[in-house]
Design a protein with these regions (language model features):
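Extended, highly charged segments
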Residues: 1-68, 89-91, 100-105
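Phosphate/anion-contacting hairpin/loop surfaces
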Residues: 68, 72-135
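A short, hydrophobic C-terminal helix/tail in secreted or cell-surface proteins
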Residues: 136-141
Length: 141
């Protein structure tokens, strides 16, 4: 699992790529549906399609894309990576989702072990509660 500085490096790299772009849609090249933790792909596209990305930041080990109506949260887990291009083998087999932006730009989520997840929340309250719960539980040990 990436450490916080590695997740922050991903945020720093992709913030200029995502910022002020509109999400056209999200696709699922390898048909692995468990990557979508909170919503099905059609419902996710209904929530984020056409939304402008207003900010990109890190919350814990989550990469958060703030849209006009909610938050798209990416957790890399063990082997997840965001990439701007993929060869066809990886796209077919290891690309769990792709975020299609306006102007023809696509960001791919490559995950060999399929542990990474994509979440959508209308507010950050649920994500914040999860992060507080896990850090509180860790303090007990």
């Amino acid at each position: 699992m990436p450490e916080l500085p590695e997740v922050q490096a991903v945020v720093n790299h992709y913030k200029p790529v995502f910022l002020k772009q509109k999400i056209e849609r999200i696709s699922n090249p390898n048909s692995y549906s468990k990557v979508f933790a909170t919503h099905t792909l059609p419902k996710l596209n209904k929530n984020v399609g056409g939304q402008l990305i207003k900010d990109v930041f890190r919350r814990g080990k989550y990469i958060v894309l703030q849209t006009e109506k909610g938050y798209l949260c990416i957790h890399l887990r063990m082997t997840g990576q965001l990439q701007e291009s993929l060869d066809s083998f990886v796209a077919d087999k290891h690309c769990s989702f792709a975020i299609h932006l306006n102007k023809g730009k696509t960001i791919y989520f490559k995950d060999y072990r399929k542990f990474g997840r994509l979440y959508y929340y209308s507010t950050l309250d649920t994500l914040n509660a999860c992060l507080l719960y896990t850090s509180d539980a860790a303090d007990e040990f």
